[in-house]
Structure formats: C-alpha cells, structure tokens
Regions:
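Helix N-cap at the beta1-alpha1 junction of Rossmann-like dinucleotide-binding domains, i.e.
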Residues: 37-41
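Conserved Rossmann-fold cofactor-binding substructure of NAD(P)-dependent oxidoreductases
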Residues: 61-74, 87
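Rossmann-fold NAD(P)-binding glycine/threonine-rich loop
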Residues: 105-141
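N-terminal Rossmann-fold NAD(P) dinucleotide-binding loop
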Residues: 12-13
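Glycine-rich Rossmann-fold phosphate-binding loop(s) that bind the pyrophosphate
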Residues: 8-9
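C-terminal catalytic/substrate-binding lobe primarily of soluble NAD(P)-dependent oxidoreductases
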Residues: 163-245
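Rossmann-fold cofactor-recognition segment
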Residues: 49-63
Length: 245
C-alpha cells in the first residue's frame, strides 16, 4: 500500500514511527510519503523513520490541486489526515475526487446555532462527513473518520461495554485528564493542536439525552473533580465540545 500522511506534527510523526517499527513481512506499507507545509519537518520525520520507503514531500492542505498532484505522483492509495480539523473538508473531498481511501483522527468542524448557541445544537462536529456517507458508499470508496483516542477508541470501548459487559447502561461520560509535562518547560503542555484545544473548550458543549435529543450547554459547564487512575489523581473536568458524542 502507498500511504500519504498529511501533517508531520505529533500525530503524523507518531503514525510514521509506528509504521517504521511494524513487522515488514509482506511489506504492506511499500511507500510512506510524509508531507507537510514545512518541508524541513517532513524531511526530518522521514529520516527519523530510516528513509528508504519513507519519502518527504511539501504539501498545502488548503490547495486541492496540490494534494492531487502529490497523490498522482506517488500513486497514493490511502491518505492519513494528521493535521488540525480546519483542513478536513478539503482533504476529505480531495480523497473522494481521486478515489483514494481516507482516515482522520478528528472530524469536520461545527457551527453554532445562530440564535441560541448555548441551548440548541446546530451543525455538529462530523455532520459534513456523515451527510456524505451514501455518496462515498456509491463510489465504492472508504473513509474512516474520527479514528483517534476520542473520538475513536472511546466509542469502541463504549460499544464493547454495552454489548459485552452490561445489561443496561444509564449514562456514558467520556473524561480526559492528564498530568504530563515537557522536560525543561514550565508552561502548559498541550498534547495536540493548541488551536483545537482552545476551540473545543470555548465552543458550546453538545450533549445527547434520551427523550430530549441533542442540546448544548454553556462552555465550562458542570465542573467536577474526577480522580483519574494510573497515578494522575484528581483533575477538575468540564463539559467541552467533542466528536464522540
């Protein structure tokens, strides 16, 4: 398989490194093109992965024609979107138009209700992609969306629990907390895109309840202290906007 990773930040680098360490029997990943607007960063990651089948390319995720050129040049079969979700629609549509399989870790952006943003849900995260399900199905192509930790693993865990562990479930909450630090750095340590982190905290959180359906609340609503396992301990958590809902 010929793979294009768009974005050589933390997510793209991690994906490339995992591929480089995987067993090579059958060489399922025969070419991995690591691309970024910052070509020097893409080159750095390709070298970290050992070069060879890992190739660096400069790419502009805002430019569909540029992405199509890279896809055609390397005969790409699969695209991993590892950039912030502001670029999702462009990359998603480029893959549809070129017939290339697609995967992302976060979904297309939401839009607030124009009159009651903290009461009524409007365009939710991922709505743009879900609305195009039938179109992708008819084309014979495949898009795996929201395949990160949350969304992604959290949804799988919830479904597994519902199917195999419990007779009934009254409520599902997804809580995310950590205590990681960057050596030598005293500021706040962000685990992924700073812009995305700030936006999901400021946007109206979306909640679904049986009998009520989708609705929104105030940002930073329902604060609570939650004791996380694994030595993390007590962390204050709040409602945020997130795709797994």
């Amino acid at each position: 398989m010929k793979i294009l990773i768009i974005g050589a930040g933390g997510v793209g680098t991690s994906a490339a490194m995992i591929i480089s360490r995987a067993k090579k029997e059958g060489e399922w990943a025969e070419k991995i093109v690591i691309s970024d607007y910052n070509f020097a960063r893409a080159e750095e990651v390709a070298k970290m992965c050992g070069g060879g089948r890992f190739i660096a390319e400069k790419i502009n995720a805002k430019d569909k024609d540029n992405m199509k050129e890279v896809i055609k040049k390397h005969e790409i079969e699969f695209v991993l979107n590892a950039v912030e979700p502001d670029f999702n629609e462009n990359i998603f549509e480029t893959c549809y138009e070129t017939g290339v399989k697609y995967m992302d870790c976060a979904m297309t952006l939401s839009k607030r209700h124009p009159e009651k943003p903290y009461e009524l849900a409007y365009i939710k995260l991922g709505d743009y992609q879900f609305e195009r399900h039938e179109k992708w199905l008819a084309s014979g192509n495949m898009a795996i969306v929201g395949s990160g930790v949350e969304p992604g693993m959290a949804d799988v865990f919830a479904k597994f629990a519902q199917k195999h562990l419990f007779d009934t479930i009254d409520e599902i909450n997804v809580r995310d907390g950590d205590n990681y630090q960057i050596p030598g750095y005293e500021g706040v340590a962000f685990g992924f895109s700073v812009w995305t982190t700030i936006e999901e905290c400021l946007n109206p959180p979306v909640i679904w309840e049986k009998g009520k359906g989708w609705f929104c609340t105030e940002s930073f609503s329902e604060p609570e202290i939650f004791n996380f396992p694994g030595g993390i301990g007590d962390v204050e958590v709040i409602n945020v906007e997130h795709e797994e809902v």
